[in-house]
């Protein structure tokens, strides 16, 4: 006979309440109103004993999931701790410094009763942790739990892959000087399957809009900002970078297995829960964090980032992914790139499609839109008129002609009406001839050269730099006629001595040609550099700190040449005293020419004249050549006159 035992049934009721009772969570935090989880829970104790026996809290993947690093592995790390700075990421009060305590707290959280809002449960918020622990331990069958927000965001059933998007450099913003990286989640969803509608992950600094440029640079360099991940549809990033800032975007599909895609997607979701890191422009930036996220695809010690590195550059991450290969039989990790051209590139290509008469008509319409009714414009055949008006509309968008007067609005309406009556043209704008960033030279460089100085004799020179690109280098996939070089260090060795001949902190130059391809359009060229250099080439130990910057004009007559004129302002000092600083101006004239892709020459001369401080007046002339051997090697020949004639023959290795 069945005997009713209140104590027996109360134990089952307690177990039911522990497993199925509800609670509430605050989005992005780990606080809960659920009943306290008992440390005596037999399921928890069994799993914890198993985890302790397997030493899971020391497993490389668990440390990856918590972003734990040892001393020197990550910038600002002086002890074994997590890079995450906000408490909401940790389920244990000691989780930031103790991975064992965080593992215990995670086990308790994933076994805790289901809450009213399933999205707040640890199995949904920390889905990467839960899935890895479940695959590593003998979990019992748990109550089914749907995660509506994650499922809607990830759309795993229709996911087709992950792409990394490289955004070209933007010299008007220091944080984007070396480019930017995005991570794009692709799917075949009928609503969000279009490339522009796909979820895209971004990492950036949480800046204060009231900070002036000096404070902005200072805080960015020394960790004064926090960084976080955000996600938006890809069209938003394409609009910001490609349309507003005229930056090319290169999309590289990643050859990950479905399981690897899931691992990356799981942790990406965790990072979107208001997780914050300390942001450093040169290291803890988008390049470092995006590469770190991709490392989640492997549950072992696989790294894409370099431990102990002092900088992280977006294009360097793309090169690392290109070289990355887990085995000799599988495909490379980085797939073939697709160019998403900037608004400026598309406009230039449209203008290039016009013949001389059509370009002349376009210039007239830019000056006076009412020329739409002129006999001259109407004399063009309809396809030509359509081409001209398409270029005109692109030009107006490129110039951001938005705040229109009433009359201009009427002219714009008329322009659109006229265009609507003309035939639709096949878009012949092509990007097939454009080379991707991974076809150019890698960003790091080692230099070995032999030097002969007319006064000081021969020497051996070694040097290194961290750069995005230099003016004389191969421009494949890089900003055209631009230079971004940092930390350019050069040492010279003579018989029984060595000397520091140069330590350039930064050297940024932009030689702007016609931005649209329309005759008469121009932008100012500009450049700036600063660092320690020799006072002149006739004195070996004479060094000074020199800062230079200026504006100029650049033109091209044949497409493979650039002629330029600059007026620079400069400051030179040998001491830290303000009174010892020489300030002056320096007009320059020069040219660059690349008759074939593997060969480029540059000539430049300048006259320096002081107007304040110790008087100085001198000329500097330089002639350089570059001959490309392979993608990773080139030869440079440099001849310079600065008090003494000096020649250098150097071999460069890029990696």
Regions inferred by a protein language model and the residue ranges of each:
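Repeated loop/turn-to-beta-strand initiation elements of outer-membrane beta-barrel proteins
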Residues: 469-477, 510-519, 556-565, 593-603, ...
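Active-site nucleophile-His-acid catalytic modules used for acyl/amide transfer and hydrolysis
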Residues: 234-315, 574, 638
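Residues that define the transmembrane beta-barrel architecture of outer-membrane proteins
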Residues: 456-462, 483, 497-503, 541-549, ...
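Long, charge-dense tracts
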Residues: 32-119
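Outer-membrane beta-barrel initiation region
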Residues: 287, 335-479
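Outer-membrane beta-barrel "beta-signal"
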Residues: 464, 626-627, 643-655
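Glycine-rich catalytic cores of cysteine/serine-nucleophile enzymes that process amide/ester linkages
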Residues: 158-246, 464, 473, 491-503
């Amino acid at each position: 006979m069945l005997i009713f035992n209140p104590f027996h049934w109360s134990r089952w009721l307690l177990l039911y309440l522990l497993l199925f009772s509800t609670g509430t969570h605050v989005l992005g935090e780990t606080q809960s109103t659920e009943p306290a989880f008992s440390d005596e829970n037999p399921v928890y104790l069994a799993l914890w004993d198993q985890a302790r026996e397997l030493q899971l809290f020391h497993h490389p993947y668990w440390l990856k999931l918590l972003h734990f690093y040892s001393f020197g592995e990550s910038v600002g790390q002086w002890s074994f701790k997590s890079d995450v700075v906000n408490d909401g990421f940790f389920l244990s009060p000691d989780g930031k410094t103790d991975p064992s305590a965080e593992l215990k707290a995670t086990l308790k959280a994933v076994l805790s009763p289901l809450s009213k809002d399933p999205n707040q449960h640890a199995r949904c918020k920390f889905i990467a942790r839960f899935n890895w622990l479940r695959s590593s331990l003998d979990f019992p069958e748990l109550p089914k739990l749907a995660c509506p927000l994650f499922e809607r965001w990830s759309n795993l059933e229709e996911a087709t892959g992950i792409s990394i998007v490289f955004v070209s450099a933007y010299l008007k913003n220091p944080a984007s000087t070396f480019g930017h990286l995005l991570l794009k989640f692709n799917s075949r969803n009928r609503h969000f399957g279009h490339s522009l509608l796909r979820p895209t992950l971004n990492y950036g600094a949480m800046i204060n809009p009231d900070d002036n440029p000096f404070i902005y640079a200072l805080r960015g360099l020394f960790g004064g900002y926090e960084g976080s991940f955000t996600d938006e549809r890809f069209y938003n990033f394409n609009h910001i970078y490609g349309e507003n800032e005229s930056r090319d975007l290169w999309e590289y599909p990643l050859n990950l297995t479905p399981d690897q895609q899931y691992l990356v997607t799981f942790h990406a979701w965790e990072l979107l829960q208001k997780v914050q890191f300390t942001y450093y422009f040169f290291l803890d930036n988008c390049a470092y964090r995006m590469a770190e996220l991709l490392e989640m695809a492997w549950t072992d010690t696989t790294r894409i980032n370099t431990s102990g590195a002092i900088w992280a550059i977006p294009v360097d991450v793309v090169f690392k992914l290109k070289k990355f290969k887990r085995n000799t039989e599988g495909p490379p990790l980085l797939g073939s790139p697709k160019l998403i051209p900037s608004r400026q590139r598309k406009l230039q290509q449209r203008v290039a499609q016009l013949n001389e008469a059509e370009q002349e008509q376009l210039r007239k319409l830019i000056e006076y839109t009412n020329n739409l009714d002129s006999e001259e414009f109407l004399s063009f055949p309809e396809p030509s008129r359509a081409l001209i008006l398409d270029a005109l509309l692109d030009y107006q968008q490129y110039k951001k002609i938005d705040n229109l007067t009433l009359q201009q609005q009427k002219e714009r309406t008329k322009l659109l009406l006229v265009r609507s009556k003309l035939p639709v043209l096949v878009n012949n704008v092509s990007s097939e001839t454009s080379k991707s960033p991974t076809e150019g030279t890698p960003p790091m460089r080692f230099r070995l050269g032999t030097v002969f100085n007319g006064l000081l004799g021969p020497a051996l020179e070694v040097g290194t730099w961290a750069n995005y690109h230099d003016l004389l280098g191969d421009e494949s996939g890089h900003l055209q006629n631009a230079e971004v070089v940092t930390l350019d260090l050069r040492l010279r060795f003579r018989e029984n001595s060595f000397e520091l001949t140069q330590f350039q902190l930064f050297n940024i130059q932009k030689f702007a040609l016609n931005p649209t391809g329309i005759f008469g359009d121009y932008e100012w060229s500009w450049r700036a550099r600063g660092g320690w250099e020799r006072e002149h080439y006739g004195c070996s130990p004479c060094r000074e700190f020199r800062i230079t910057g200026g504006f100029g004009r650049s033109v091209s007559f044949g497409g493979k040449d650039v002629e330029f004129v600059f007026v620079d302002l400069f400051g030179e000092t040998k001491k830290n005293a303000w009174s010892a600083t020489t300030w002056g101006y320096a007009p320059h004239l020069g040219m660059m020419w690349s008759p074939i892709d593997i060969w480029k020459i540059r000539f430049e001369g300048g006259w320096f004249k002081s107007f304040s401080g110790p008087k100085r007046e001198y000329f500097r002339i330089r002639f350089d050549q570059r001959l490309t051997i392979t993608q990773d090697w080139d030869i440079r020949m440099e001849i310079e006159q600065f008090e003494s004639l000096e020649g250098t023959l150097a071999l460069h290795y890029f990696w």
